[in-house]
């Protein structure tokens, strides 16, 4: 292809199947490397010297009270938002129903907020909530409902702009909200980074597992080995997962194909490292920290750089839009790394007798404090992410057939055992398993591969 003449790095493909993004420094193009986050290089006299210039260092400060932390978060975040608003042009703000973007929008005091959604179901469409929130803070909300056909039609162009394949369905939604905002301004604020630095992902709480983890490690390992021999289902998977140490089971927020499953799926042999070989250097840096902090540290170095910020940067730049992230200000980071774990993820029994864990606890209290009373309930809202109805679409004839044709095409036959790909698709359609994320991971690679290695035409915005 004239788009890119480099050879494909098949080791990157194998790791992508597990992580849903490219986690290593060598890219999908053999011999082309990425500079690691927070590093710089000097090339002099034929030698390349790569140095790290910044690193997060979690060290809990036990002296301040919870109220003190809440006030510090509030003050520091206000300063960050004000600094990120400085511009010669109008600034807007993205808005979902989550606490992160709501906190940004409420403090920023911008005139315009932007939201996208899918269909009419509330779990896939936050537009109604965003409009209500915007009205409560006296701002104008601009929104767009993304139709399935335009979502799918934009995939080649979006994978082109990503440079490397990314299987996060939210990247497409992010493209559309960036496009919406770009029609009226050039700079937006967004809420990326809050989950990683303040402890916001649901997996950090892993509710209901702590009692089991108090059992002796040897007993849990024994139960795990028995469970591994049984047919897979939710209960069995719990015992398999909880028999493993954190370093074995957590590689970040996405875990698509296990090393065993990806090797069974691939027709080609690669020299890809095991996922644990990729994560081990990061875990080694936080050996003495608790599990929540270990997960945050890993996500900050892999997930945030390889998925969250990558798609934010690529999709905004594809629309000539500057996206700014006030949660990732160095002063906010310096504060967050000192907050004790018990104020990041808190176990708070409910009146009904349940044992819920509240993530991002101190930050949620700061958001509640700084948000108008009629909108403060967002601070307690369960995290949704950026919901996309992929699992629903893959059961519909149009998109099932579209993916199946790709899974049986020449590129798929080159890299995969295609009968196993089709089996994943058929089992999903029949309701035997939710394989939507696995299917999407493979499909996005094949869409990307077609753009960069099979097509001579750079994809442009479709007329849908």
What spans do the regions from the language model cover?
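Membrane-proximal basic amphipathic "stem/tether" segments
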Residues: 210-254, 443, 459
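Cysteine-centered catalytic environments shared across enzyme families
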Residues: 1-162, 174, 178, 368, ...
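Gly/Ser/Thr-rich beta-alpha loop segments that engage phosphate groups in nucleotides
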Residues: 33, 94, 99-100, 193-195, ...
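Short catalytic/ligand-binding loop motif for oxyanion handling, primarily in non-cytosolic enzymes
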Residues: 61, 101, 196-200, 205, ...
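Donor nucleotide-sugar recognition loop
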Residues: 165-169
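Active-site adenylate/phosphate-handling loop in enzymes that bind or generate adenylated species
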Residues: 176-234, 303, 309-332
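Short low-complexity, flexible loop/linker segments enriched in glycine and/or proline
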Residues: 156-160, 182, 204-206, 391-393
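Adenosyl-5′-phosphate
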Residues: 4, 31-37, 47-48, 170, ...
């Amino acid at each position: 292809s004239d788009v890119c003449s480099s050879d494909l790095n098949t080791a990157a493909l194998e790791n992508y199947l597990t992580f849903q993004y490219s986690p290593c420094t060598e890219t999908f193009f053999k011999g082309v490397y990425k500079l690691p986050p927070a590093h710089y290089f000097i090339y002099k006299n034929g030698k390349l010297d790569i140095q790290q210039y910044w690193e997060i260092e979690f060290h809990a400060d036990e002296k301040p009270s919870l109220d003190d932390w809440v006030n510090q978060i509030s003050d520091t975040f206000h300063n960050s938002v004000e600094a990120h608003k400085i511009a010669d042009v109008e600034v807007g703000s993205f808005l979902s129903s989550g606490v992160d973007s709501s906190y940004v929008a409420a403090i920023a005091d911008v005139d315009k907020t932007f939201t996208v959604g899918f269909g009419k179901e509330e779990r896939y469409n936050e537009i109604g909530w965003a409009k209500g929130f915007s009205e409560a803070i006296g701002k104008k909300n601009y929104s767009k409902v993304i139709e399935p056909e335009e979502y799918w039609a934009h995939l080649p162009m979006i994978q082109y702009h990503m440079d490397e394949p990314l299987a996060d369905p939210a990247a497409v939604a992010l493209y559309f909200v960036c496009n919406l905002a770009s029609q009226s301004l050039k700079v937006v604020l967004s809420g990326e980074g809050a989950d990683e630095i303040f402890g916001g992902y649901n997996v950090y709480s892993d509710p209901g597992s702590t009692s089991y983890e108090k059992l002796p490690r040897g007993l849990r390992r024994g139960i795990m080995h028995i469970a591994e021999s049984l047919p897979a289902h939710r209960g069995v998977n719990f015992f398999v997962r909880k028999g493993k140490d954190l370093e074995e089971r957590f590689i970040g927020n996405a875990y698509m194909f296990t090393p065993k499953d990806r090797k069974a799926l691939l027709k080609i042999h690669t020299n890809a490292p095991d996922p644990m070989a990729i994560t081990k250097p990061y875990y080694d840096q936080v050996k003495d920290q608790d599990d929540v902090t270990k997960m945050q540290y890993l996500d900050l170095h892999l997930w945030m750089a390889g998925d969250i910020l990558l798609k934010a940067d690529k999709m905004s730049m594809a629309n000539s839009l500057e996206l700014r992230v006030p949660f990732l200000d160095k002063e906010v980071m310096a504060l967050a790394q000192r907050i004790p774990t018990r104020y990041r993820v808190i176990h708070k029994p409910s009146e009904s007798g349940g044992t819920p864990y509240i993530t991002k606890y101190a930050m949620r209290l700061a958001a509640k404090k700084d948000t108008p009373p009629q909108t403060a309930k967002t601070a307690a809202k369960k995290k949704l992410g950026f919901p996309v109805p992929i699992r629903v679409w893959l059961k519909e004839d149009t998109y099932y057939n579209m993916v199946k044709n790709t899974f049986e095409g020449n590129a798929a036959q080159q890299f995969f055992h295609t009968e196993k790909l089709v089996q994943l698709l058929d089992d999903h359609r029949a309701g035997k398993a939710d394989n939507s994320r696995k299917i999407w991971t493979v499909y996005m690679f094949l869409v990307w591969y077609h753009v960069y290695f099979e097509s001579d035409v750079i994809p442009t915005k479709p007329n849908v």
